[in-house]
Structures are given as C-alpha cells and as structure tokens.
C-alpha cells in the first residue's frame, strides 16, 4: 500500500540535473504531488529544465501531480524560498522542503513524513529535519521515537513544517523583538552567554538585511515561540553543494564533520546494540549546522587533525 506523503516542495536554481535526481528519488518513494519553484532568468538554463521535465510522466510515473513555477525574474535564494513556501501553504497544510543540493533517500522521505504526521499537533512543534552532523552508515533509522529527538536548533537540509507554524514566520525581525527574547523566551534564557552573543549577532544582521538569510529568521521564530525541531539521531540527508562550483553559499565551506557519500547510506541492517549505544552518546549533542554552540565540534576537529598529523609521522 502506498504511503500518503505530504506535499513536496523542491527549490531549484541553475542545476536541472540535481533536481532531476531528486525527482527520481521521489518517484521511487511513490510520492504523488510535487511542486518545483525555479529561480532563474537564463533562457538556456530554462530550456535545459524543460528538456529534463518534458517527458516527466514517462520518467516519473508515480508522480501524478507535478507542477513547475519558472520565476519570470531572478528573485534570489531568500525570496524564492520564502515565496514558494508561502504560495504552497495557501493550498496545503503540511510541506516537506528540499533545496536542489540536498541529498536524500526514499527512507528519508518515509521517516520525515512519519514524524511530521505524528508530532505536528504537539504544542512545541516547530519543524522536522532530516539532518544531523553525525553519520553512521550501519545505524538503522526508523520513525520510532527512540531514534529521533527534540532540539532547539533548525538544520534546513531537508525539512518540513505546517501552515500553522509558518503563519508565525516573518523575514523581518525588529530590534525590539530581539530584545524581548530575554523576557519572553524560556529557550533563549536557557542558552549560555556565548550562545546568546552569537545568535544575537546573527539576528541583528538579519534585521539590517532581511534578504541575507531566511533560515536565521526561522531559528528566531523557534526561540521566540519556544518551539522544537524533531531530528534524527544520525543524519538522513546531506549537501552536495560543498563539492559543486555552482553552489554560491556552500562551495568550499564544508565543516569537518560533514560526511561524504551521504546519498549512499544503507541502514537496512537492524543493529540494535549500536543504536542503543549511539543514542546514549549522541542524545546530548545538538545538531545544527549554523548553531552558536559548536565549540565541542571545533575542539573535536582540532583534536582529529592533531591525531592525523601524529599518525602520519
């Protein structure tokens, strides 16, 4: 029996080959409804997209409802994502969202969808994400709550949320809202001084230039409303952009802990004792690519480099 998936939103840029690969995965997962929002002003790139999508019914027979929106003007990453999500939430209650450089598998979709369905009505629900900085190819993932955890941080590499949450989102953050976090947010007051300093700086940058980011503003929403993100213990998505010269925001900026070949994850072996051990160790580590509390990862990175140097002598 086919699973009932939430609406899928793909965010496309100048790489039709990556979007095509994502559609192949969505087709294998038997998703029915997909919308693609493509930000470009290049006629040649548009023709390439159209060529890839021309025979979509033959290439992706399981996707029965595929819609594509070619932006007439180049909107930029932030406005394209923001507008596409707002437009889709006018028609759908829930969305799973993937930018074109996000790597994911059929199991990613199944798990994200299951967790979104299960926890969307929780009072503290903010989003669900497929990403964690920790990777273990032998660790099985499931929709079982023991392999998922709540975090105050938002990794946007394959994620989902609801219309109810998104209605509270705003690209524009006022100075007063940032100051009010001290009085209104329990989550904010549980951060240490270092974390507050980092996030406050990022929020002020977004205040001055709302077009700079969109995910920082979503993180602000989570803090402001004391909402949580449901994350896997071990990553179920990755980002190909670190190796892609077309990736404006991520090329050449790969954190040391991001694993390669994430798309080849194979977690079908049910190794229960490994999962139990990993859960106990990693339940205390918050996964967020852009978090202000990554000093533990930085320390580990320096330690790892030192060990590698010593081992090569």
Predicted feature descriptions by range:
Residues 1-97, 102-313:
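An acidic/histidine-cluster motif and surrounding catalytic segment
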């Amino acid at each position: 029996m086919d699973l009932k998936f939430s609406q899928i939103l793909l965010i496309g840029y100048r790489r039709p080959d990556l979007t095509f690969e994502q559609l192949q995965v969505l087709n294998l997962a038997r998703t029915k409804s997909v919308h693609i929002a493509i930000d470009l002003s290049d006629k040649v790139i548009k023709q390439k997209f159209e060529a890839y999508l021309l025979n979509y019914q033959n290439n992706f027979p399981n996707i029965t409802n595929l819609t594509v929106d070619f932006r007439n003007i180049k909107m930029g990453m932030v406005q394209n994502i923001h507008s596409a999500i707002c437009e889709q939430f006018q028609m759908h209650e829930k969305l799973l969202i993937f930018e074109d450089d996000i790597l994911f598998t059929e199991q990613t979709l199944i798990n994200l969808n299951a967790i979104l369905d299960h926890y969307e009505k929780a009072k503290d629900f903010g989003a669900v994400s497929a990403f964690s900085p920790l990777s273990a190819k032998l660790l099985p993932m499931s929709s079982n709550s023991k392999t998922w955890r709540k975090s105050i941080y938002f990794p946007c590499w394959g994620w989902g949320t609801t219309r109810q949450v998104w209605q509270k989102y705003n690209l524009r953050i006022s100075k007063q809202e940032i100051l009010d976090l001290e009085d209104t947010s329990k989550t904010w007051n549980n951060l240490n001084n270092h974390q507050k300093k980092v996030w406050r700086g990022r929020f002020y940058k977004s205040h001055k230039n709302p077009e700079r980011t969109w995910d920082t503003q979503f993180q602000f929403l989570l803090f402001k409303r004391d909402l949580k993100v449901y994350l896997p213990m071990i990553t179920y998505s990755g980002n190909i952009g670190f190796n892609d010269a077309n990736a404006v925001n991520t090329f050449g900026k790969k954190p040391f802990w991001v694993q390669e070949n994430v798309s080849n994850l194979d977690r079908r072996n049910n190794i229960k004792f490994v999962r139990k051990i990993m859960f106990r160790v990693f339940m205390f580590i918050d996964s967020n690519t852009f978090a202000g509390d990554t000093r533990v990862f930085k320390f580990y990175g320096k330690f790892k480099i030192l060990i590698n140097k010593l081992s090569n002598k």
